[in-house]
Amino acid sequence: MDPRTNPYAPGAGTIPPELAGRDEIIEKASIALDRCRNGLSSRGLFLVGLRGVGKTVLLTRISQEAEANGFAVVWIETPEKRSLPALLIPTLRTALLKLDKMAAAGDLGKRVLRVLGGFVGAMKVKYRDVEFGVDLGNELGVADSGDLEHDLAALFTEIGKVTKEKKTALVLFVDEIQYIEEEQFAALIMALHKCAQNQLPIILIGAGLPQLVGQAGRAKSYAERLFEYPTIGPLSQSAAREALETPAAKSNVKYEKDALGEILLQTQSYPYFLQEWGKHCWQYAKQSPITLNDVRSATELAISELDASFFRVRFDRLTPGEKKYLRAMAELGSGPHRSGDIAALLQKEVQAVAPTRATLIGKGMIYSPSHGDNSFTVPLFDGYMKRVMPNFNKLF
């Protein structure tokens, strides 16, 4: 069928044409934001899940609705090896300038910009990647000590006073939050805790891989009471069918029942893969309805494209030792797998491969669902490892 009218949208954080099965989490976030703005107790959210489940899509949709409803929105994505201040400062400045232009700005709006200026100066000394050329002035003695935990709490307190005065709330959206260094993560959690204690309207909506739950608890023990951790998983079968059928129906295209069943089987109902299969089914099929044979042919195309992009970009970041570790996991199946079983397959002691396991967790390739267990963070990655490294025995 015509590729120009293909409705499916596989992509990193691309909102699909039909955001099916996620109404409950969107409503949960909306309630939390409204309660925060109204001065009521509310917990932030950490959306937790594997790659390809649509965490970034949800953050984007929630942030769009927040901005449309008058919230002050700050969005950051936390790549590896960037400091939290370097990521926060530019986006906070933009949000504060918008707040300063709102009605009832008062002296607090000017003051908080000066406080941010002092924070910038202090962080430039401590973190080499903080680069900010605009002079905002400073408010001597506030958020300028150089101690991140103290200064971030002071900065957020001043911001909270402004948002409270203007009857709004600052919503901090943080994607890939698991990459924040633990000491900096602790400072962020403490700053938000301080705001919650003082009923100041600042709230965090974050997203990350499953290890985020443990990371937050290690950073600050009270994080479990400050945030909720909804799990974002594959879609239900009905939602998965809706994600495929609704966009197609707008162009009068239908799927045969067994064709839909085959897509759900191949994708395991993961949102990203549903979009990928939908795209290739549309492009392969000659006409409506899309048949089982169309899906089987499209499956080969979808897997080939995933191997060349979605999977490959992650594989290319790995060292030879890390590739062997993941290939051993794949040999055992989709997981989870005991560290001892992986080590035995690699013909090594558990302690010998522990550093490799640690770096793979740090890179976001695997996580530990329970002590001593290991699972892939990327769905279907075990199949890819077998395709890209087909002969496990030749690794030795």
Which residue stretches match the model-derived regions?
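Conserved catalytic segments around the Walker B and adjacent sensor/switch elements
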Residues: S63-R82
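Amphipathic alpha-helical "lid/sensor" segments that cap RecA-like P-loop NTPase cores
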Residues: A122, A240-S309
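A short, basic N-terminal segment
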Residues: M1-R43, K394-F396
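C-terminal leucine-rich, beta-strand-based interaction scaffolds used for sensing/assembly
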Residues: T5, R43, D258, R296-E300, ...
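Walker A/P-loop nucleotide-binding motif
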Residues: S41-R61
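Conserved Walker B catalytic segment
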Residues: E139-P210, R218
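Short regulatory helix/loop adjacent to the ATP-binding pocket of P-loop NTPases
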Residues: Q211-F227
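Conserved P-loop NTPase mechanochemical-coupling segment
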Residues: D107-A153, T157-E165
